[in-house]
C-alpha cells in the first residue's frame, strides 16, 4: 500500500475522495493504492449505498445500520470502520455508547423505536435469514423510507 507521501496526482485525488469524515483513509480502500481506478470504483459503490444525496435516511443511521450488520456478520474490521463514522456523525458520546452496546447485545429495541427499530430488524433478518424475507418485509421497509 502506498502512503499519501508516495502518491502521484491520480492517487492523491483518489485518496482525497476516499477520506472518512475525520480525514483518514480506511485500509480496505488504501489497499487499492496501486490501482487508483479500483479505489474509485469501490468508493462509487460505497457512496451510492451509504452517502448518496438521494438517500433519505440520515448518515448517522446509515452508518449505524452498517455497524449492526457488521456485528451480525462478526466482522470486527467492518465494525471498526462503520462505527467510527457513526460515532462521529452521532456527535453525542453518551448516546453513541448506549447505541453501540445495544447493538453489540443484539437488542436494538433498547435504543430504537418506530422506523429506526423496523430498519434494524429488517437488516438483521436480511443478514441472518435472507431466505426468510417475504414481500411484506420489503414492502414494509419501503413504506418507512
What feature does the model see in each segment?
Residues 1-56, 94:
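Mobile cap/lid helix-loop segments that border enzyme active or cofactor-binding sites
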Residues 25-34, 59-74:
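Alpha-helical scaffold segments that form or flank carboxylate-/histidine-based iron centers
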Residues 65-89, 100, 133:
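Short, thiol/selenol-centered motifs that function as redox-active sites or metal-ligating centers
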Residues 66-69, 114-133:
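Amphipathic, charged-and-aliphatic alpha-helical interface segments
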Residues 95-101, 139:
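Ferredoxin-type iron-sulfur electron-transfer modules in oxidoreductases and energy-metabolism complexes
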Residues 102-112:
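Acidic/His metal-coordination segments adjacent to aromatic residues that form catalytic metal sites
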Residues 143-145:
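Conserved small/polar residues in nucleotide/adenosyl-binding loops
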Amino acid at each position: 500500500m502506498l502512503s499519501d507521501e508516495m502518491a502521484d496526482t491520480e492517487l492523491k485525488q483518489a485518496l482525497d475522495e476516499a477520506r472518512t469524515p475525520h480525514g483518514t483513509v480506511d485500509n480496505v480502500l488504501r489497499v487499492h493504492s496501486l490501482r487508483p481506478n479500483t479505489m474509485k470504483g469501490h468508493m462509487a459503490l460505497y457512496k451510492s449505498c451509504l452517502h448518496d444525496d438521494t438517500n433519505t435516511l440520515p448518515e448517522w443511521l446509515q452508518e449505524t445500520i452498517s455497524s449492526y450488520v457488521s456485528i451480525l456478520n462478526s466482522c470486527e474490521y467492518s465494525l471498526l470502520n462503520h462505527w467510527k463514522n457513526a460515532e462521529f456523525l452521532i456527535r453525542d458520546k453518551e448516546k453513541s455508547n448506549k447505541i453501540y452496546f445495544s447493538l453489540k447485545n443484539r437488542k436494538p429495541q433498547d435504543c430504537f423505536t418506530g422506523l429506526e427499530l423496523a430498519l434494524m430488524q429488517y437488516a438483521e433478518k436480511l443478514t441472518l435469514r435472507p431466505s426468510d424475507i417475504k414481500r411484506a418485509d420489503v414492502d414494509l421497509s419501503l413504506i418507512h423510507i
